[in-house]
């Protein structure tokens, strides 16, 4: 009988441990997981000016983003039930959004269901990813300016490294 009680105790302990682990994962899944969006060709990160809705997004080198600006380059990757993702900026709380073909990308109030805020990733042979709008399959790309980089959308071009991205650890504020 002692062996039966001992086995039952082990089983109950195992169930308790598994319950605690799975509960911890659920709690952790509700925490924001910030990342930065890094252009492989230029080595710059997409950031928000944090000036409100319908403002253009830009990119700069990590060493140029200091103090509170570091969090402007951090994005929470949120998953939609349809398999797409959307990006929420850590400081502004706004989402990356398509504005128009050959126009700069803007940030706007997040809805989670706005078609122009939904993205898919496409892994390419170099190991980089293309970040594609789900509603029209256009990709975001980085264009170099004189003092900073601009972020645009256009037809995807796998041969143009301006379209190559990586999701990297966030900048620490």
Locations of the language-model features?
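Bacterial N-terminal signal peptides
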Residues: 12-21
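Sec/Tat signal peptide C-region and signal peptidase I cleavage site
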Residues: 24-28
């Amino acid at each position: 009988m002692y062996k039966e009680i001992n086995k039952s105790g082990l089983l109950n302990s195992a169930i308790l441990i598994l319950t605690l682990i799975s509960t911890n994962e659920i709690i952790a899944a509700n925490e924001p997981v910030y990342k930065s969006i890094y252009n492989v060709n230029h080595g710059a990160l997409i950031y928000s000016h944090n000036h409100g809705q319908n403002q253009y997004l830009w990119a700069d080198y990590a060493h140029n983003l200091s103090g509170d600006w570091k969090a402007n380059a951090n994005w929470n990757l949120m998953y939609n039930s349809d398999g797409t993702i959307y990006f929420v900026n850590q400081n502004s709380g706004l989402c990356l959004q398509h504005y128009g073909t050959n126009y700069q990308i803007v940030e706007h109030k997040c809805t989670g269901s706005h078609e122009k805020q939904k993205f898919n990733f496409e892994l390419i042979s170099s190991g980089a990813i293309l970040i594609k709008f789900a509603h029209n399959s256009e990709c975001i790309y980085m264009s170099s300016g004189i003092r900073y980089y601009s972020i645009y959308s256009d037809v995807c071009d796998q041969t143009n490294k301006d379209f190559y991205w990586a999701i990297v650890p966030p900048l620490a504020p």
